[in-house]
């Protein structure tokens, strides 16, 4: 079983953030890829359609820029594993190609004081014509 396709989330300040499970231990406990404090309430989640949500996000960014010429992307490796599990890797790669994404797989991203998993972080470069 791959935990990449079944993330749990924690609610912080009204927003939900993934806390990805690394593996199940022999004693029944779980090891996470990022910090989970004692007593934190975790909620089972269901991921959005990876391809559709990526396409929608890139379209929103491209529209705001007047077109995206290039995206430097940092894509959590767990998203790649999830795409493989759901047989969406090729379709997701097509979206990345359509929006000029180049970059790296990562082991999560830093957002403020939080280490996040199963996220895509990027820098989009484009330009509006005047």
Region locations from a protein language model:
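Small-residue-enriched flexible segments
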Residues: 1-99, 106-130
């Amino acid at each position: 079983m791959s935990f990449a396709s079944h993330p749990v989330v924690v609610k912080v300040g009204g927003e939900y953030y993934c806390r990805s499970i690394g593996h199940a231990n022999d004693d029944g406990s779980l090891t996470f890829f990022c910090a989970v404090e004692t007593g934190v309430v975790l909620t089972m989640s269901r991921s959005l359609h990876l391809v559709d949500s990526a396409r929608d996000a890139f379209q929103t960014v491209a529209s705001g820029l007047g077109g995206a010429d290039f995206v430097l992307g940092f894509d959590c490796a767990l998203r790649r594993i999830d795409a493989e599990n759901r047989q969406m890797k090729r379709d997701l790669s097509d979206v990345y190609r359509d929006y000029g994404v180049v970059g790296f797989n990562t082991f999560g991203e830093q957002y403020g004081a939080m280490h996040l998993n199963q996220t895509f972080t990027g820098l989009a470069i484009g330009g509006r014509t005047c």
